Amino acid sequence: MKIGIPREIKNNENRVGLSPSGVHALVESGHTVLVETNAGSGSFFEDVDYKEAGAEIVAEQAKVWDVDMVIKVKEPLESEYPYFKEGLVLFTYLHLANEEKLTQALIDRKVISIAYETVQLPDRSLPLLSPMSEVAGRMSAQVGAEFLQKLNGGMGILLGGVPGVPKGKVTIIGGGQAGTNAAKIALGLGADVTILDVNPKRLQQLDDLFGGRVHTIMSNPLNIELYVKQSDLVIGAVLIPGAKAPRLVTEDMIKQMKNGSVIIDIAIDQGGIFETTDKITTHDDPTYIKHGVVHYAVANMPGAVPRTSTLALNNATLPYALMLANKGYREAFKSNQPLSLGLNTYKGHVTNKGVAEAFEMEYKSVEEALHL
């Protein structure tokens, strides 16, 4: 199989689809890998590293897309749509429930698109999303602490406080991978941390994990309002695989927050959980202020720590990439049900229910679309 690794063009996206070691594994399995010039430079992998791993370095963006399978990090941008072709396997993060134009382009060009974030194991865990959820969660507490500083628009609060001064209050909505990792860092900074989740069993697990050092609260509209308005930092970390994020925090709740408080919307790439995160921001211009509250809505948070993120992502995605390359997508889907759940579009059909519902499109199951 011929595989392409393009350079990411999203604002300040410095990750790359595969590390040199990942490329080497594919080449050793008999595949041809084309890597776009400087694709790995943001993660401090040089072209020579990829060449030594067996890749062919190509300068033309069109050439790296003229392959059997493209492995990326983030969803293609509009300038990349012309490279779509029937039968192309696209393996990347897609978050299509918030990307109607991209979804339509994939359907129109009959692309076989496999989204990292919807590959799901029998225990409902998301193996290709988890590493980036860990990174984004940990970053969210660090970023929140940074933007609480007065010089960054915040109210000038130190999350850990000092003796005789209250700690900063951090509320995390969602107790999954991202929320749990946000809590780890916020606790490490010395903050007063509350996690809200809809699953009582998960709250019990979190209470055990943190030894009672975090407040665990059932998530419902009344509790969300109560804790949001008294918080210095609110982190949104709710995920419904493949579907748009629910708008759990209303504009009225935001209006009740203190001036200079901060919200971090980790779920912004799926539409966000705050009614007031009505636009996606970038690492170049990460925040805006609305109702006196600092809003951080960067959709590719892990892109700011690309070396760590690329290596973590490569560890998770490579076994699936090898499976797709070695077996072909049909046999790979037949033999690995979790991977088949990653299929979002197939030759003109939407094969993810959450995406189909988001845009009122016709849904076909993977088995029906592929006649498995």
From Swiss-Prot:
Keywords: NAD, Oxidoreductase. Pathway: Amino-acid degradation; L-alanine degradation via dehydrogenase pathway; NH(3) and pyruvate from L-alanine: step 1/1. One of its GO terms (cellular component) is plasma membrane. One of its GO terms (molecular function) is alanine dehydrogenase activity. NAD(+) binds at residues 169-199. It comes from the Bacteria. GO terms for biological process: L-alanine catabolic process. InterPro entries: Ala_DH, Ala_DH/PNT_CS2, AlaDH/PNT_CS1, AlaDH/PNT_N, AlaDH/PNT_NAD(H)-bd, NAD(P)-bd_dom_sf. It is an enzyme of class 1 (oxidoreductase). Its EC number is 1.4.1.1. The active site is at residue 95. It catalyses: L-alanine + NAD(+) + H2O = pyruvate + NH4(+) + NADH + H(+). May play a role in cell wall synthesis as L-alanine is an important constituent of the peptidoglycan layer. Belongs to the AlaDH/PNT family. NCBIfam families: alaDH. PANTHER family: ALANINE DEHYDROGENASE. This is Alanine dehydrogenase 2. It comes from Staphylococcus aureus (strain MRSA252). The lineage of its organism: Bacteria, Bacillati, Bacillota, Bacilli, Bacillales. The gene is ald2.
